[in-house]
From Swiss-Prot:
This is Glutathione S-transferase GST-7.3. It comes from Serratia marcescens. Conjugation of reduced glutathione to a wide number of exogenous and endogenous hydrophobic electrophiles. It is an enzyme of class 2 (transferase). The lineage of its organism: Bacteria, Pseudomonadati, Pseudomonadota, Gammaproteobacteria, Enterobacterales. Its EC number is 2.5.1.18.
Amino acid sequence: MKLFYKAGACSLSPHIVLRELGLDFTAXKVD
């Protein structure tokens, strides 16, 4: 799974959920 995020956006919550569930994901920063 890929998690696309932008600095300063509200993408922290999904990141926390993915980590807590132990799911594998790749975080990809977008401009």
